[in-house]
Amino acid sequence: MRAVLELTRRRARNARFARARAVVGARARAADAQELRDDSKGGSSVDKATSTAAEARETAHTLEGFREALRHGPGFDDFVRGDVAYSVPAPKSLKDKTTRKPAWLKREVPGGERYTEIKSKLRELKLATVCEEAKCPNLGECWGGGDGKTATATIMIMGDTCTRGCRFCAVKTAKAPPPLDKDEPANVSKAIAAWGLDYVVLTSVDRDDIEDQGAGHFRETVQRLKASCDVLVEALTPDFRGEKHLVELVATSGLDVFAHNVETVPELQRDVRDRRANWDQSIEVLKHAKKSGAKITKTSIMLGLGETHEQVVNALKLLREADVDVVTFGQYMRPTKKHLAVVEYVTPEAFKRYQEIAEEMGFLYVASGAMVRSSYKAGEFFLANVIKQRKAKEAAAAN
């Protein structure tokens, strides 16, 4: 009699488990079906709504089903006896927080004769570009140039390994990277002269392991470039730990644009950047560069990290107070699953609105769009014209 009762209880438990699993499966299938229907509609105006709504719907359905399955699932005694084979798969939303990319973020695979030429020369001279290291989606477009466009490249000097570990960045990190290549300034100037580029961006990893943090190396590279060819040079620098004499060393090197990125709004600095970097320090770097003689200062902000509209507007006000001339906005793109997840894919309409707000504040130039990066070629085309016009006026005044 006891055996019959135990068998009846076991069958009842298994029936409950089966019903719970069916609930999870049915809700997951319903979410998938709805997502497919949403995808079939297409159109950029609904892409963001589709990606966020589908994610929220899936989270609600799978989490609810998961909790229900656990409520009706086996107890501790069941597992101790070992007579029940049961499992509840974790909901997808708990395992993968990746937000689907909307249609406006798609880019063609880079290629073409100019692209191949530049890539080959980089390998030959053992040079690194942030375009490749940071997996920039605009690589093919920027390296192309031609047809009246400004051909640009962003060369990353001082190695491909950084001493810092910002949570958004794909560049390799180490406490003690390899020593600086003393031939690098000469190789960079040789490569740029051979390519015939109009505008070059020099950037670098952070080198906290070096006494001057690479400021002298940066300065030498700029000076060699300006001496070897007629090219406009933008220096996108690290913060040099806020040491003003090092900032000044680069700012007075003969560059045309001094750039340093604040990366995100003040409120998110600690979550996004390495602990040795912060908003106030970056603002002081930009201020001192202008004070030292840099005629154009520039910075960049990533969007989609969880910032609010009010925080972005406030950041713009602070940048104008620091006399920053150029600001760019771009969509944060998660380089790997080890990096910060994307909180939001900002719509083209929102990017346009931020551009309008910044322009109303008096910035010299604003580039704002999902695929815009701090060294984006459209901005360089504008800056190239601004710089050339200023130089022409200065020459005319001197005569």
From Swiss-Prot:
Binds 2 [4Fe-4S] clusters per subunit. One cluster is coordinated with 3 cysteines and an exchangeable S-adenosyl-L-methionine. Residues 1-30 form a transit peptide. Gene3D superfamilies: Aldolase class I. PROSITE patterns: RADICAL_SAM (PS51918). InterPro entries: Aldolase_TIM, Elp3/MiaA/NifB-like_rSAM, LIAS_N, Lipoyl_synth, Lipoyl_synth_mt, rSAM. It catalyses: [[Fe-S] cluster scaffold protein carrying a second [4Fe-4S](2+) cluster] + N(6)-octanoyl-L-lysyl-[protein] + 2 oxidized [2Fe-2S]-[ferredoxin] + 2 S-adenosyl-L-methionine + 4 H(+) = [[Fe-S] cluster scaffold protein] + N(6)-[(R)-dihydrolipoyl]-L-lysyl-[protein] + 4 Fe(3+) + 2 hydrogen sulfide + 2 5'-deoxyadenosine + 2 L-methionine + 2 reduced [2Fe-2S]-[ferredoxin]. SUPFAM superfamilies: Radical SAM enzymes. [4Fe-4S] cluster 1 binds at C131, C136, C142, S375. Pathway: Protein modification; protein lipoylation via endogenous pathway; protein N(6)-(lipoyl)lysine from octanoyl-[acyl-carrier-protein]: step 2/2. It is found in: Mitochondrion. Keywords: 4Fe-4S, Iron, Iron-sulfur, Metal-binding, Mitochondrion, S-adenosyl-L-methionine, Transferase, Transit peptide. Its EC number is 2.8.1.8. Residues 31-41 have a biased composition (Basic and acidic residues). GO terms for molecular function: 4 iron, 4 sulfur cluster binding; lipoate synthase activity; metal ion binding. Belongs to the radical SAM superfamily. Lipoyl synthase family. HAMAP family: Lipoyl_synth, Lipoyl_synth_plantM. This is Lipoyl synthase, mitochondrial. It comes from Ostreococcus lucimarinus (strain CCE9901). The lineage of its organism: Eukaryota, Viridiplantae, Chlorophyta, Mamiellophyceae, Mamiellales. The gene is LIP1.
